[in-house]
Amino acid sequence: IILSDTFYEFAHPLMKQLGWPTIFCHKLETDEKGMIAAYKLRQPDQKRQAVKALHGLNFRVIAAGDSYNDTTMLGEADHGFLFDAPENVIAEFPQFPAIHGYEALKEAIRNASVRDIPA
C-alpha cells in the first residue's frame, strides 16, 4: 500500500506505469472549466491513521518515509525507516533508522519482516 500526500489526479500516470498499485492519497476538486478549485484531504494525518487501521485488522506494518509528514506514520508502524531523507530530518528524528538506497531499504524490510522474504 502506498500512503502519499499527493493527489490522485497527479499520481494517476505513475500508478498506471506501476500496474495500478493501491495508493491512498488526496483528491483535487475542479470547476466547470477543469481548473483546480479546491482540494479534499482523505483525513488529517492520513498516513498514521492508515497504519492504525491496518493494526486494527491485525496487520504488522513496516513503513518508510523521507520527510516530516511521514514521521507520525513511522512512529505508529511496527518498524519505521527514514529512506533517503534530508540530513535535518534524520537529525531531528534519530529514533528512526536512516536508510540510503533501494538495496539497503530492501534489506531493512527483510530484516524487519516476520516472513522469510527472499533476497
Predicted regions and their residues:
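C-terminal cap/substrate-recognition subdomain and adjoining C-terminal extension
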Residues: 1-119
